[in-house]
Structure formats: C-alpha cells, structure tokens
C-alpha cells in the first residue's frame, strides 16, 4: 500500500526539485526548466545526451558504515567539483520531493520506523523488513532523480549510498536474525527486476572506519536509538561491504577507499578523482539511443517504482484491501494531494481553469 502512495508522486517532482537548486557551475548549463516532458519528438529534433554530457558528467556515490562521515565528504566533493549533492535518501525522501516537502505520517511512508528498528530490531510486527524494503524504494527513486538530473543538465551528481549498496543492511539484518529468509528472497526478487534497468555509478568512494571507532562516534553523537546498535550488526555491514559490494563494484566502475583520517581531506580526494581514467564500466558502451531510453525511464516515477510491488504474499509488507482503500482516501484528503501540483485550491493554487 505504501508503495502505491509513493507512486503517486508526479513525474515532474524530481525536475521541480532539481530546478529549485539549479545553477551554473564551471560552465555547465544546469537549468532543467522545461514545459514538456522529454520524449521521441524532442529526441528527433536534436535533444540528445551527447550534446550536454562531458567528462564531468559523472555519478559518484560515497559509501561506508554508519557514522563514517559520508555526508560531509559527499557535500564537500560536490562543492569542489561543481556537482549536485544528493543527501542520503531516508524514509521521508518521497515527501521531500512532493507536496510541500514536509514529512508525512508513518501510514504514508511504509508504516515503518528507523527508531523502532534500533530499539527492537526483532519486533514481530515486521517493522524491520518493511523499513528495509521502503528504504530500497526510496533509494531507487532518488537514484532515478540523480540520473534524470545528469541526463537533463549534464551536471555530475554525488550521492550518499545507492541502490547498489543497499543490500549490505539486508545481509546484516538476516545474519543477526532480524528478518526471515522469505524476506531476503522477496528483496532479491524486487532488486533483480528493478536494478537491471540502471547504470552503476562511475565511481564509488568507500570510507573504511573500524567498528570500534564507529561505535565511539555513535556514542559521541548521543542519539539514544542509535546507541543501541550492536557491534555484531555493524561488523556484518562492514563484511558485506568488503566481501561483496566492493569486489562487485570494482568490476563495474572505479573504486577509491579511504581511512577515516584520509576521508577528512576532501581536497586530496578530489585530486585522486581528477587522476582517474574512468576507462571501464557500462557507461562506456552507451550512445544517444540507450541514454534516450534511460531518460524516458527515470523521468517516469510510476515506471521507476512499478516493479517494487510484486504479487507475492509476505506478511511483513502485505495489508488488506479495505485498509489500502482507507489509507489511500486519507492520503488524497491531505492538502495539495488530491490533484496534480498547481490544481489544488486548498493550498492556494489559482487560475486553475486557465491551465
């Protein structure tokens, strides 16, 4: 049900967000203000990716365990390279790109809670897997937004984690006994039919911080919920990164690894990026036609999320038809959610009959 609400995000949502932060950086034309959606006629009339993509049109993801400084490094890299920074997608990412941008209630956001997961990861109400499933969908939506921005403007993007690294949490949850094998199977099936449509990042930056140091940082941060995270869970996340994620990504893209101390020097990291040749991975095989189809996909948020809902009964993520109908109608009664943006009088939209 929650995914149905997520799909209600208008196709232009990401474009509106991107446009709000668009700017000219180092000669990159980053305006995405457009009246019509991209389609076949615009492609035939010459609107092709090769005209705007340059050597600085890159997708970079910054990965690492919890509290490793990913956000700080990602933001600094983006500023120094003139890229757009996408903060890590959380539970409320769909809210941030639709409506008034304010977080909505849990009923409209996967009916899950990160705080509850930290407090009771073995909760028998299915919160743990609902959380992981919802976060994957949020990251999928954000990755499509990042690619849409790249293909529309030519400006590079920097993300904190992505759909390609999301599984490290699933592995840790399963190894710790937080979720059932059926949940893992469901996740892998959803992932297999969604991630295949997307190109991996050009570069993955991994910040390697030992688990004891991660725990020290969590304690210093002082979040009462995060402080309950066990060292075993953190170690499983690290193992998934080092044993599975990094070896797999090293075959698809460039990979840079830094210690906690090295990651603090963003200037040195940017210098390392400048020296990379970017001479491997599927991006090298793309042409105007393949990028045209990719752009059509990522601008259509309904299609992006379509296969995250598969017809499999799993108690953790399944609710009844009556509850679905009730929540959907409640969602439609929220200010600005009944009609497309610009057509809701209750939030001040005017001259609707002229649009």
Swiss-Prot record:
Subcellular location: Mitochondrion matrix
Alphabetically ordered keywords of this record: Electron transport, FAD, Flavoprotein, Mitochondrion, Phosphoprotein, Respiratory chain, Transit peptide, Transport
Phosphoserine modifications at: 250
Subunit annotation: Complex I is composed of 45 different subunits. This a component of the hydrophobic protein fraction.
Cofactor info, note text: Binds 1 FAD per subunit.
Coiled coil: none
Cofactor (UniProt): FAD
GO cellular component term, pick one: mitochondrial matrix
Location (main, coarse): mitochondrion
Name of the protein described by the UniProt record: NADH dehydrogenase [ubiquinone] 1 alpha subcomplex subunit 10, mitochondrial
